[in-house]
């Protein structure tokens, strides 16, 4: 699990700081990997990680660890504190004894004054988005699976889904009513990268590649305690693969944070490796930046033409899954400020230096 931090100074820069958390020798809960963590700052002011811990047989739990900082103020290590969630609900377990609580994201939802975790529950039917709430980050109440209403005649209830995160404030839905908004990546049949990797161009079907969607549900203190909470009834396809580095699919990454330019997310895109070695994984996961309109997040103000992070280090080119960088949380630097280059790219759409390949 590597960390990278953005410094908004004379220009937006991305610097790798190193490995923050690795598999603990002798820990059976981590024998197959430690990856894809959520992060959140608790009521005590501490920063906590919620990594996916993978045991033998791809059995995944969500751990909790306190981040330790060095004298320079950079993350330097973690203190393991136990398990936040492990497969217990029916929708997290499979008949063969397997299961998983995977790839969490955590947002403090301000109108509800509560932390919301979105995670992938590896159910008997396949991966689904599950929700949980907490007041302190240590005690979590499951809300069950998120459900999605039909979209233009397409039934979404039985569609696999991943990479979910919610906005921290109410967002106008397509009708203009403020609701809880979630970013997610439905896996419609026939859209997986392995299925379309040899297709030279998009097919006629509108839902031909995995994309980032935004969906909405009623949000209030009353709805939180009812069975209406987590029922997302209106939808909008936010973004589809555009650039070569994301040709096969895109998916959500970090939960959205508000800047003066709009909602900032770091997302992932997948492309085919040009010259994969024999027996190697043929897909490459990279990261890009997207900025959404503050008032109308379904409007994209900017997105990366080139990736801002690609797998280059040995730990990124081999391991649990090869050739992958996968963003799940960003933490603004303490003295971060908007830059001229960011203002310029939002004004005229030009690609700044920090979005170009080295």
What are these regions (language model features)?
Residues 1-32, 36, 40-99, 108-161, ...:
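Beta-rich carbohydrate-recognition and catalytic domains
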Residues 102:
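Metal-dependent C-N hydrolase catalytic cores
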Residues 105:
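Glycine-rich phosphate-binding loop
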Residues 164-169, 253-255, 327-332:
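Beta-rich, blade/repeat-based domains predominating
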């Amino acid at each position: 699990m590597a960390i990278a931090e953005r410094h908004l100074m004379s220009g937006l820069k991305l610097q790798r700081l190193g490995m923050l958390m690795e598999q603990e020798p002798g820990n059976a809960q981590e024998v197959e990997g430690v990856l894809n963590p959520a992060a959140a700052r608790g009521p005590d002011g501490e920063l906590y990680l919620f990594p996916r811990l993978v045991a033998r047989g791809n059995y995944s739990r969500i751990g909790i660890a306190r981040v330790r900082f060095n004298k320079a103020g950079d993350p330097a290590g973690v203190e393991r504190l136990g398990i936040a969630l492990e497969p217990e609900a029916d929708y997290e377990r499979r008949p063969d004894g397997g299961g998983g609580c995977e790839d969490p994201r955590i947002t403090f939802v301000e109108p509800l004054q509560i932390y919301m975790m979105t995670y992938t529950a590896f159910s008997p039917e396949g991966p689904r988005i599950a929700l949980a709430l907490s007041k302190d980050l240590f005690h979590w109440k499951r809300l069950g699976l998120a459900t999605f209403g039909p979209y233009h005649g397409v039934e979404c209830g039985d569609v696999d889904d991943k990479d979910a995160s919610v906005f921290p404030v109410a967002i106008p839905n397509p009708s203009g009513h403020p609701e809880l908004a979630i970013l997610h990546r439905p896996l419609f049949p026939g859209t997986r990268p392995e299925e379309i990797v040899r297709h030279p161009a998009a097919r006629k079907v509108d839902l031909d590649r995995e994309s980032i969607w935004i969906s909405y549900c009623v949000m209030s203190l009353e709805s939180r305690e009812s069975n209406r909470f987590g029922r997302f009834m209106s939808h909008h396809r936010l973004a589809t693969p555009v650039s070569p580095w994301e040709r096969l699919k895109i998916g959500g990454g970090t939960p959205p944070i508000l800047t003066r330019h709009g909602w900032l997310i770091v997302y992932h895109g997948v492309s085919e490796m040009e010259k994969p070695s024999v027996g190697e994984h043929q897909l490459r996961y990279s990261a890009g930046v997207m900025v959404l309109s503050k008032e109308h997040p379904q409007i994209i103000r900017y997105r990366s033409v080139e990736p801002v992070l690609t797998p280059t280090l040995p730990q990124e080119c081999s391991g649990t899954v090869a050739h992958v960088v996968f963003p799940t949380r960003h933490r603004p630097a303490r003295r971060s400020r908007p830059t001229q280059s960011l203002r310029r790219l939002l004004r005229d759409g030009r690609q700044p230096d920090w979005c170009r390949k080295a």
